[in-house]
């Protein structure tokens, strides 16, 4: 096969070309390759989209200007409204019950899920963080304080103050009647969800400052730090059950069932047993001495769907792995720039967000 190259070809275009002509680097040949086609395009009214949300078979989007809901079966959004925030919406919209929750660093707001009608807007006293949303309440940081907001009215049910001059930028999480909160002071708090009363606190500040993400499965809180450590913590007592050292910072992790998945910049995808922190499997993404086979770094969150793990790298290649054993099943190379978000809808379709502000339904 002879390839004629003119002008400047970037890595993404080269990967797409290799897929087209049936070529692929050594080390990736066990995975099938595919090129996606765009089946539907939805204009969002945004220049820059945040990651997409998903609830009840509906896509949710927000960005620098608007908030909206999409039925993937329809050619036009169900509704799109100007969000009216004084700064861009920076995280994916959350939804639970009848509310869609969206915000930026200066405000947090709620909109009606069915119609997009605005319900309330809560202005920051210091800086709004990322919320965790339940059907009745939204839990969100404002500066060093955690607030519990009523989803119907925006009324503050309670506040819990941590150490001044810290920023609770990352989302808390909720399991049963407990809210878990790590505001960036090296502490993890367990609070009583109805009234904000402190149940226990864990101080491991010698190892972490921020807790970036938290998931609860059964009796285990899986907490990622903005360092190289992933924790398993007993939800009732705060006892550390295990620590996993990834070898470099953990951008994000994902929990499905009794397995936590993460990408480490050391060049591995790990699947971790959440009960004891042992490695179920690992998949190499950086092959030293064979740069052509390397994955690009990842900003997008890992996603599981129908026992597959979806990993979108920064070269716009979607890697599909068997979630049970880590075998790479498929590589899907996009020829256009994407935002770091992917929402699998079926085994051959997904929703993605383009760098031009479109939400796209793609098929491969």
Regions found by a protein language model. Give the residues of each.
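N-terminal secretory signal peptides
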Residues: 1-9, 16-23
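Extracytoplasmic beta-rich repeat domains
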Residues: 34-54, 79-94, 118-133, 159-175, ...
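Conserved beta-propeller blade signature
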Residues: 59-60, 100-101, 138-139, 179-180, ...
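Structural signature of WD-repeat beta-propellers
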Residues: 62-64, 103-105, 141-143, 183-184, ...
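Short loop/turn segments that connect beta-strands within beta-propeller blades
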Residues: 72-74, 113-115, 151-153, 192-195, ...
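Tandem repeat domain/solenoid detector
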Residues: 117, 145, 155, 187, ...
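Blade-level signature of beta-propeller repeat domains, shared across WD40, Kelch, NHL, RCC1
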Residues: 339-364
């Amino acid at each position: 096969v002879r390839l004629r190259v003119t002008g400047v070809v970037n890595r993404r275009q080269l990967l797409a070309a290799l897929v087209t002509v049936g070529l692929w680097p050594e080390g990736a040949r066990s995975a099938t390759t595919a090129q996606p086609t765009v089946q539907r395009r939805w204009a969002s009214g945004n220049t820059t989209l945040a990651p997409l949300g998903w609830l009840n078979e509906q896509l949710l989007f927000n960005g620098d200007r608007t908030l909206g809901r999409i039925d993937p079966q329809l050619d036009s959004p169900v509704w799109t409204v100007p969000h009216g925030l004084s700064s861009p919406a920076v995280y994916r919209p959350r939804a639970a019950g009848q509310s869609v929750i969206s915000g930026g660093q200066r405000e947090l707001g709620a909109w009606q899920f069915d119609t997009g009608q605005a319900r309330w807007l809560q202005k920051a006293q210091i800086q709004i963080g990322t919320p965790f949303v339940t059907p009745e309440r939204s839990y969100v940081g404002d500066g060093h304080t955690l607030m519990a907001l009523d989803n119907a009215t925006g009324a503050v049910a309670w506040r819990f103050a941590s150490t001044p001059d810290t920023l609770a930028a990352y989302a808390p999480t909720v399991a049963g009647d407990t809210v878990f909160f790590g505001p960036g002071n090296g502490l993890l708090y367990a609070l009583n969800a109805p009234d904000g009363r402190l149940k226990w606190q864990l101080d491991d500040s010698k190892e972490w400052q921020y807790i970036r993400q938290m998931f609860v499965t059964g009796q285990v809180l899986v907490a990622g730090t903005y360092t190289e450590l992933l924790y398993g913590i007993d939800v009732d007592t705060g006892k550390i059950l295990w620590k996993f050292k990834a070898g470099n910072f953990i951008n994000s992790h994902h929990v499905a069932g009794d397995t936590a998945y993460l990408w480490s910049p050391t060049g591995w995808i790990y699947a971790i047993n959440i009960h004891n922190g042992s490695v179920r499997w690992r998949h190499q993404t950086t092959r030293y001495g064979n740069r052509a086979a390397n994955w690009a770094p990842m900003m997008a969150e890992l996603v599981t769907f129908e026992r597959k793990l979806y990993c979108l790298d920064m070269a716009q290649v979607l890697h599909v792995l068997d979630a049970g054993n880590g075998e790479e099943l498929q590589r899907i190379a996009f020829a256009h720039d994407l935002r770091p978000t992917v929402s699998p809808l079926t085994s051959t379709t997904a929703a993605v967000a383009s760098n031009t502000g479109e939400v796209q339904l793609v098929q491969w």
